[in-house]
A protein has these predicted regions:
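Second-shell loop/turn segments in exported
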Residues: 23-30, 127, 285-292
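Extended basic-aromatic, gly/pro-enriched interface segments that bind polyanionic ligands
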Residues: 114, 168-299
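Structured, hydrophobic secondary-structure cores that serve as assembly/anchoring elements
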Residues: 247-375
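Extracellular Cys-Trp
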Residues: 55, 76-214
């Protein structure tokens, strides 16, 4: 009834620094708050196009929104109330929310991290493909135990200028936690498709680890490239879903520094598995893990449990270490007896004596076969 009594209402305010004078607002025929908001918006549009007026039923408030965003988006409380219109819609004592600078992906990731740091994979909206924000996200990810899946549509990656591209810069920075994928179609989210395939691995299974090489990427356009173009992509460790002899395959599954993705993914899993098992050993103990050789043996059992699962899932296999030592189990665990631990560490209840070395099973990507034939 208060609104319907207004036949020639008005008020003044500023929107983005521009004075807006609203007048001759007739609400005598409205039957809802939404209709009243629509009538006010019609007047606002004539003064400041794009300015909106709506009614939020959940809050029970009228909301006026400027037509822009960012730090230049400002609005002021209404004044010069005519016929009580501003008072009726709560604009004389309204809560003001001014525009802010655009949040960068790096800022958003930091906020996510502070709220819940359990996420592992990172990918950005396609609007950030091939812009500085994607490089910043890659650097952000590198500083944490996470993986960034980057998508590029930059055709320069297919030419001799590839090293100057953002992907080339990622290679130069040796970003071991960034996987870059070239997609011929803008907005394809090729990197997201890679993440979806990569994260299907069940490390608690048997022979479940995989290489990304030769895999399919559903809904991703296949790139038809010349050998020269493929070479330029390879020179900057940029992956691609391409046509190879009539077959669609992902090539080659490397990170920006040249490390294969499955190595990074697998060792991250192994670290998390061992850390979790050792933590649970202490957390679930009704008493304690004693600082004795018996306590150290309990820790070693948990470390070996993770390594054995690494053998089971195919991450680890018997083989030679870099110094030529053959490990029949695929791993070796060493430890320091409690008697050799420093008094300072024992006094602080810190044990640093367990180390291990493991041999990765790896994967075969290319095969060279030689032979001869005589008749």
């Amino acid at each position: 009834a208060t609104l319907q009594a207004i036949t020639a209402g008005g008020f003044t305010m500023t929107v983005n620094g521009t004075l807006v004078v609203i007048s001759a607002v007739n609400l005598s025929a409205v039957t809802s708050f939404a209709q009243a908001a629509s009538a006010i918006q019609t007047k606002l549009q004539t003064q400041k196009p794009g300015t909106l007026c709506s009614y939020d039923a959940s809050l029970g408030k009228f909301v006026i929104t400027s037509p822009t965003s960012g730090v230049t988006s400002t609005i002021t409380v209404a004044s010069a109330d005519v016929s009580g219109l501003a008072a009726a819609i709560g604009m004389l004592s309204a809560t003001l929310v001014q525009g802010k600078s655009e949040e960068t992906p790096e800022d958003a990731l930091t906020q996510c991290e502070q709220y819940d740091n359990s996420f592992y994979g990172v990918a950005l909206d396609s609007e950030y493909d091939d812009v500085q924000a994607s490089y910043d996200a890659a650097v952000w990810t590198q500083a944490r135990n996470k993986v960034f899946f980057n998508t590029t549509n930059d055709a320069d990656c297919l030419t001799a200028t590839a090293p100057t591209t953002l992907v080339g810069q990622m290679k130069d920075a040796s970003l071991k936690r960034t996987s870059a994928t070239y997609g011929p179609v803008a907005g394809s989210y090729a990197g997201v498709s890679v993440a979806g395939r990569a994260f299907t691995v069940n490390f608690e299974g048997t022979n479940t680890t995989l290489t990304l090489m030769y895999k399919k990427l559903p809904a991703i356009t296949v790139a038809k490239l010349s050998s020269s173009q493929k070479g330029h992509l390879a020179s900057i460790n940029c992956n691609v879903f391409l046509d190879a002899g009539g077959n669609s395959i992902y090539d080659e599954g490397k990170m920006a520094d040249g490390t294969f993705f499955d190595t990074v993914h697998g060792t991250d899993w192994l670290q998390n598995r061992i850390e979790t098992d050792v933590f649970n050993l202490m957390y679930r103990s009704p008493t304690k893990v004693p600082y004795t050789d018996t306590g150290v043996s309990m820790i070693i059992q948990k470390v070996e449990r993770g390594l054995r699962q690494g053998v089971t899932n195919g991450l680890i296999a018997p083989g030679q270490t870099t110094d030529g030592t053959y490990l029949e189990l695929g791993y070796r665990i060493d430890y320091i007896p409690v008697s050799d631990v420093s008094d300072a560490d024992k006094g602080n209840r810190i044990y640093r004596g367990v180390t291990f070395i493991a041999v990765g099973a790896g994967a075969i990507h290319k095969i060279t076969i030689t032979g001869s034939f005589s008749e």
